């Protein structure tokens, strides 16, 4: 990673602002603090964020840390992760993020998460075990290809063993053994 100034600080600010707003909304959703109108507003925000990221990808490819800095690159990744309504966009974003990883312009862990999200959104088994379902009484791993070798695959992308990741998520989202009495929610960033 680099500490030099980003080439496009304007894009960095926009990505960070959008991801921050979306994260605040998502935190309320996980705690079941939103009514139907607010849930709809969140979906609208995700759609608008997807369109902004789509424009950025078309103009610049993946907005990695050279273009926008590490914080904004993480924001772009977060926005992409929540583009569930557009599986084709998720796949395209994962491809561009993969190229950025190869150019040392983005973390490989971000690619693994986005790759898994693109797979699960397309109703395919994930590779790295990053996609989870938060239920009222438990956390479930979304379907996984070859679960017996997931830790080997996770190691290739600098992710901890699946048992460690699941325990971290359980402590974060189920501190008292329940998940805030919430409906099912897909967790992407935690695993």
Residue map of PLM features:
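N-terminal helix-rich structural modules
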Residues: 1-123
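Mature-region segments of soluble proteins
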Residues: 74-186
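Short intrinsically disordered terminal tails
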Residues: 1, 189-191
């Amino acid at each position: 990673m680099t500490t030099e100034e980003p080439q496009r600080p304007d894009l960095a600010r926009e990505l960070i602002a959008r991801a921050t707003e979306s994260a605040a909304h998502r935190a309320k959703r996980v705690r079941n603090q939103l009514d139907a109108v607010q849930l709809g507003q969140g979906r609208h925000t995700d759609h608008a964020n997807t369109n902004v990221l789509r424009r950025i990808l078309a103009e610049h490819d993946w907005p990695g840390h050279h273009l926008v800095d590490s914080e904004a690159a993480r924001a772009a990744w977060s926005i992409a992760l929540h583009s569930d309504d557009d599986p084709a966009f998720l796949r395209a974003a994962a491809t561009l993020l993969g190229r950025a990883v190869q150019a040392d312009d983005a973390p490989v862990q971000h690619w693994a998460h986005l790759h898994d999200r693109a797979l699960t959104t397309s109703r395919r088994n994930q590779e790295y075990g990053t996609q989870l379902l938060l239920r009222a009484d438990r956390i479930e791993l979304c379907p996984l290809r070859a679960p017996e070798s997931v830790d080997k695959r996770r190691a290739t992308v600098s992710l901890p063993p699946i048992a460690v990741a699941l325990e971290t998520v359980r402590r974060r989202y189920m501190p008292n053994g329940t998940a805030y009495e919430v409906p099912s929610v897909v967790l992407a960033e935690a695993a």
